[in-house]
Amino acid sequence: MQISDFILVIIGSVALAAGVKYVFTLTSGSNKDKKGGEAEKGKQVEKALDPQEYRKFQLKEKFIVNHNTRIFRFALPNEDDILGLPIGQHISLRAVVGGKEVYRPYTPISSDEERGYFDLLIKVYEKGAMSGYVDNMFIGDSIEVKGPKGKFNYQPNMRKSIGMLAGGTGITPMLQVIKAILKNPSDKTEISLVFGNITEEDILLKKELDELAEKHPQFKVYYVLNNPPKGWTQGVGFVSKEIIESRLPSPSDQTMVIMCGPPMMNKAMTGHLETIGFNESNIFTF
């Protein structure tokens, strides 16, 4: 189920005139915001991104995911505009924090099928300059965005199998690729995702991932938790070489592994993959 398939239920007192931030929770409902990926006849679809300059986008809505993670929805200039972000690419956010310019890369969890806005899943860190800045924005405030950026360009059926290793909010570029593959009937790429987190509550977008796996046999997901709950039946501890060997495709010219997580995780995973037999050309780190 996509974010655009939810209705918004306001919790707490909010008052735009008083400058109070909007806080939302999510329940299933209407998909009225989703316009679809096809252009209406007679209308030109405008891409909102510019790779050469930063453009301002207003915060439209804010969704609470858990105690430290939010989904921020930013409005595009017109309701029929698309962000214009190729699969596998990301955007750069710029803001002035404490008198200094701060830049951070983010991958939207929305796609160009959702017109008029884009969604960012952001974990708010206690001392995170950009995440704290965005979390403190009021509805109507603007953030500067530039893109597309990135070196990964996904093409349908570019490999027979793609393995994915994600940690925390590193799930965002993975979800972008997963959804692109699964919505294309002619793309037969097999996808295997290993997703590491600390607790079950930390697993972001779990419901959507589980629904995609249930609906599409070509997609499999395996969760690994440092601190699992009682009765947990999947991976425990850290993502190991043994887990990678059993859950991801074997090395070959027709397979590759893409990963996104904390730097220490990426370094460890690269070591495991090389030990298993993956060469550098078949490994990509976001």
Curated annotation (Swiss-Prot):
Q: What keywords is this UniProt entry annotated with?
A: Endoplasmic reticulum, FAD, Flavoprotein, Membrane, Mitochondrion, Mitochondrion outer membrane, NAD, Oxidoreductase, Transmembrane, Transmembrane helix
The record's SUPFAM superfamilies line, in alphabetical order, gives: Ferredoxin reductase-like, C-terminal NADP-linked domain, Riboflavin synthase domain-like
List the cofactors.
FAD
Q: Spell out the Gene3D superfamilies in the cross-references.
A: Nucleotide-binding domain of ferredoxin-NADP reductase (FNR) module, Translation factors
- Record: residues binding FAD: 135-150, 161-193
The chain positions of domain FAD-binding FR-type read 52-155
Q: Does the keyword Membrane apply?
A: yes
Q: What is its main location?
A: endoplasmic reticulum
Q: Name one GO molecular function term.
A: cytochrome-b5 reductase activity, acting on NAD(P)H
Q: Which domain of life is it from?
A: Eukaryota
According to the record, the segments passing through the membrane are 6-26
Topology relative to the lipid bilayer, per the entry, is: Single-pass membrane protein
Q: Which Pfam families match?
A: FAD_binding_6 (PF00970), NAD_binding_1 (PF00175)
Protein EC? 1.6.2.2
**Subcellular localization:** Endoplasmic reticulum membrane; Mitochondrion outer membrane
User: Single GO cellular component annotation?
Assistant: mitochondrial outer membrane
Q: Which reaction does it catalyse?
A: 2 Fe(III)-[cytochrome b5] + NADH = 2 Fe(II)-[cytochrome b5] + NAD(+) + H(+)
Q: Indicate yes or no for the key word Mitochondrion.
A: yes
Q: Which family does it belong to?
A: Belongs to the flavoprotein pyridine nucleotide cytochrome reductase family.
Tell me the function of this protein. Electron donor reductase for cytochrome b5. The cytochrome b5/NADH cytochrome b5 reductase electron transfer system supports the catalytic activity of several sterol biosynthetic enzymes.
| Record text on subunit structure and interactions | Monomer.
Protein name as annotated: NADH-cytochrome b5 reductase 1
Organism equals Dictyostelium discoideum (Social amoeba)
The organism's lineage is: Eukaryota, Amoebozoa, Evosea, Eumycetozoa, Dictyostelia
Q: Which gene encodes it?
A: cyb5r1
